[in-house]
Amino acid sequence: MSSSAADPSAARLNSDVRQRHPTASAASEDVEDALLQQQKEADAAASRAKKTYGKTPDGTVFVVPTTHDMVTQLLDPREPKNLSDVAVLAIIALHFLAAYYLPWGVKRPLFAAIFMFWRLAYNVGIGYLLTIQSKYKLLVTWAKRWKLFENPATGKNPRPWLYNLLKKELETKIPQDYKFEEAPIEYNTWLTFRRVVDLILMCDFISYCLFAIVCAHKPDGEGFFVGFARWVVGITLVGFNLWVKLDAHRVVKDYAWYWGDFFYLIEQELTFDGVFELAPHPMYSIGYAGYYGISMMAASYDVLFISIIAHAAQFAFLVVVENPHIEKTYNPPQPRVRSESEAGSQLQEVASEYSVPSTSGRHNDNSPQPVHNLIGLKNLDFFRITDVAVVLLSAYLAVVTMVTPNTRFYQALFVLHALAWRVWYSFGLGVILTMQSEEKMFTRHFLKYGESLGEAWRQWKGIYHLSNCLCHASFIAACYKMYEFPAGGDNGWALLKHVVGLGLIALQVWTATSIYESLGEFGWFYGDFFFDSKRQLTYTSIYRFLNNPERVFGTAGLWGAALITWSRAIFLMALAGHFLTLAFLAYVEKPHMQKVYGRNLRDDAGVTKFIKRSLPPPVTEWQQSIDKVLDETKHFIDEFVEAARSRLATGSSTIVKDTSALFNKYPARLTISKISADLAGYDPKHYGLSLAGTPVVGTNEKATGKESPNARVLKDVKTQSFEYGAPIRVKWTAPAKHSKKDWIGLYMVTDNRSREVTEVPSLGRWVPTNPGEYDTTTDQGILVWDQPVEKKSEDTDLVEGEMIFEGDKLWWTQGVFEFRYHHGGGHHVMSISEPFEIQIPKFDDEHRGVDISAGSGEVGERAVEAALLPVIRNCLDRDPDIAPSNADERFGGHVERDGKYARRVVYAIRHMFGIDFAPAVVLADGNVRRLAWRICHAKEVLAPFSMSHTNGRTTPVDSKFSE
């Protein structure tokens, strides 16, 4: 027996101790469990924070799993491989085998063709797929229609083997956070699309490199240092290209690399740093520097030219495919402002431009802004003196250049002529702008003679535009005179100089275009020198990367021309032009910008910030010391110029004082004579169409008094007439067994000769009778379908439906139209509606009791507003986000994005009021009230030339002739 058993008290003590030990241990375990639980929750929260969430168009939110780039997936042995990887690698291997075994004479043209095939597959093939996905979600629609991702367990998938293959392929690549069955169909479609992209991109790059290898050679007579420099520059460009691609992929990940935003959006802020601060669209611009590096290493003009073609095709892909989608997705139109608190202070600045005498005497504070721009061929107007002067002087210069001989005298004369225009353009106009900035000299000159600020602004724009055009025209003429066709022994270098020179010229043209798109007409002509600008500085387009793009890129064309001509005189001209441009920026533009915008000016642009962050500390310190020396030098020059400013101002003041639809029909008519085999059993008498719309003209207005008495009698049959742009409802009737692919199209009555077969395409003006049968967004017009009709005959069961034609499905012109019911996706006509008319009623001021041409003031404007508002609402599709509900509300942002709305409005105004406006007028005015003011103002100006009784007569019959 133990001692504890013999001693009861000891036994109780031991028992208590044993009981207390488990209690303490349990408490400790609870604390540990709590800590572990907290750690797990923290880890889960951190994991959730690291995860990316996607959102489909229908609002489904899902976790976007981590994926890897195509090179890693294909070539990294640590990554799992699947059947599609094997297929891609096999096709790549075929390229290498062809490059190795084919005869030498066949390799070059064959690989050029292979590369162009893959490049077309990239830019045209992928571009087409992305376009239809962006506009219609067509890739996702195809996946739904083919039931690619429908679980076979439901019994609805006709191809279970394909489902299992896709499941295995995709889940092998994404082992975490991804289940094939649970992922949204948009994400699965994107993953499938990625595999096609991987094949095309890899083959595109491999075929290009093999073509370069096939074409590579050492030029005859090339020295060691030239060859060494060629390889160093080429390797540097390829390395730079590789860094651009890797850094771009680091920023945008696979989501943007594979155009994921065409399928779904990610719920996080998009940040663009690194290479995206260096250049616009770096993957398509500087991201192709490696092409030119490989061309240098290959020393082949064939590789260079095919690189230029491929690069140009990539820019076309960017403009046609990506930019429209980016605008639609990330830069949608701003919500329409439904009230205007600002009365139009900016309008008052230019109201004086409309200084036509008014008989009404009304106040024109809300007069609209002018929209007659100068820049661009589309704005060329031979009724404007500036444009006429530019064209005539340029033509004179071209004729003189062509007819004069290329002697040294004329060459020197043309160079001096170009230099004089360059000095006037930079120095002369710079002095005028400086005096305008400091003293408003240019404006004061016109005010002195009773002119307005608007007149001064117009005259300045004309002077600047004429000087700009003739400065460049005279430089081109000088280059023409100095150009000599390269000799036979210099063809190699001459070709390179021409290619690089043309590239520099294209760079300057692109820079000027980007500057104009960013600044607009106001900024291009230095409008803030003339008006008190209330605009905020926005660094968009090229200004996102550079503060002054003119400093380097703005004169690139001068150096390009110098390379092409290879003339010392043109090199000196380019140097002088570059120096004058830098001086203009430093002494004219920069001081004014600092005075007007002050601290709102940023110090460093995107490129500068990136370079400063990339420099090591010693280089940064050296750069700061150099900046200090340059600042001190600049201050010295500023003091020197300030001392001579009064003399320059006096001299320049003396100089200043003393000196416009494609065919509606398809080009080839298509007559379908073969009737569908399944047409048997369908009787056209069982089909019917009826219309409902907004009527516009009564039958009593059809009789004008010019007809015979019999023709004035009202007929039983009344032709329907609907408002221009108003939606039209179509009710159809068909047999219950009608084809689900039937469709109804809208046509002009005169477009089709046959009543049995439609001969012309519908051009998008059609709606199917049943949803889900076609791949585009035509289903949007369907309202009701396949509703049983009360049986009126015992032989056929009928159904009916209703659809609406609006927006782009309408004809935006006047005329007589009809609807046609077509069978089974073909063009065989089963029924034709009664013809109806689309008409724009003319504004009849005589019957309205106002005479807007005679200055009836606000009464006339209100009458015009009342007549114009419903028409404009129709033109803007009656969309509450675009169309105004009253005369003061501004038009929606879509009007500025899509020119079709403005063209509809000006067409309606031309037929309502007889006034022909440019579409830009609609954008400038922005609401019905200003448009009404402009219409009244135009009618007032044209009143003496009107043929109507109220607006005037062509012959002054009220006054007697002198005897």
Curated annotation (Swiss-Prot):
Q: Which GO terms fall under molecular function for this chain's record?
A: phosphatidylethanolamine N-methyltransferase activity
Membrane-spanning ranges: 86-106, 110-130, 196-216, 224-244, 274-294, 301-321, 385-405, 413-433, 463-483, 492-512, 569-589
Q: List cellular component terms (GO).
A: cortical endoplasmic reticulum; endoplasmic reticulum membrane; perinuclear endoplasmic reticulum
- An example Pfam family from this entry, by short name, is PEMT
Q: Report the PROSITE patterns cross-referenced here.
A: SAM_CHO2
Where mainly located?
A: endoplasmic reticulum
* EC class of the enzyme, as a word: transferase
Its recorded reaction(s) are: a 1,2-diacyl-sn-glycero-3-phosphoethanolamine + S-adenosyl-L-methionine = a 1,2-diacyl-sn-glycero-3-phospho-N-methylethanolamine + S-adenosyl-L-homocysteine + H(+)
Q: In which pathway does it act?
A: Phospholipid metabolism; phosphatidylcholine biosynthesis
Stretches in topological domain Lumenal: 1-85, 131-195, 245-273, 322-384, 434-462, 513-568
Q: Which domain of life is it from?
A: Eukaryota
| Region span, Disordered | 1-32
List the keywords (alphabetical). Answer: Endoplasmic reticulum, Lipid biosynthesis, Lipid metabolism, Membrane, Methyltransferase, Phospholipid biosynthesis, Phospholipid metabolism, S-adenosyl-L-methionine, Transferase, Transmembrane, Transmembrane helix
- Does the record's keyword annotation contain Transmembrane helix? yes
Q: Where in the cell is it found?
A: Endoplasmic reticulum membrane
Q: What is this protein called?
A: Phosphatidylethanolamine N-methyltransferase
Q: Which organism is it from?
A: Sordaria macrospora (strain ATCC MYA-333 / DSM 997 / K(L3346) / K-hell)
